[in-house]
């Protein structure tokens, strides 16, 4: 099944973007080629842009604290797997402690590093990081891969508590949902929400159908419409019945 996720609010939208950026960063950092480490570095700059929001850290801390207070009363409950509960609570408490130790504006260390700031300003220009533009950066790219990797890992280090917090919040949100099998009649599906508030919708479709879900929602109803794309033609609505799995997640 192919998984599509749709955030219902700006906070979850930001967390999903950060998750995607951190995953891309980790992938390219693990590679060996200087061009792949260039992508890791520019992704680091993107992470800094998104995490630079003044309220992101406080929002994550409030959500983790809320989850901690929700889960803590289940300690000693015979109906709850205690080892799993303690693992989650320990992870939350450690991440809260790490977030509390973060000082100043997120990503400020990248701004204060004049060399990185010069690369960052050139990276937004198409082809702006050529060797004749940034010879010192080109020289750094000739260093051994492990040395470059250590440098980039050092630069991401102050942001890792945010990554851990994002991972926990999204995992708890996803685990809160229960998948149901539904059918989009003639490619269209709608469902009343009965006033319940959700943060995230997951749509899983069989890959062999080659359909693309488009979703929207308000506090009363959600809609899923399936489209198909042929070659370079823009997606068009399908008129066949589409079976899929729908999950609504609520922290």
From Swiss-Prot:
Assembly and interaction partners: Interacts with FtsZ.
Origin: domain of life: Bacteria
NCBIfam families referenced in this protein's UniProt entry, alphabetically: PRK05287.1-4
SUPFAM superfamilies: YacF-like
A matching Pfam family: ZapD
Role: Cell division factor that enhances FtsZ-ring assembly. Directly interacts with FtsZ and promotes bundling of FtsZ protofilaments, with a reduction in FtsZ GTPase activity.
Subcellular location: Cytoplasm
Gene3D superfamilies for the chain: YacF-like (1.10.3900.10), YacF-like domains (2.60.440.10)
Signal peptide: none
GO cellular component: cell division site; cytoplasm
Protein name: Cell division protein ZapD
Gene this chain is encoded by: zapD
Keyword tags: Cell cycle, Cell division, Cytoplasm, Septation
Family designation: Belongs to the ZapD family.
GO biological process: division septum assembly; FtsZ-dependent cytokinesis
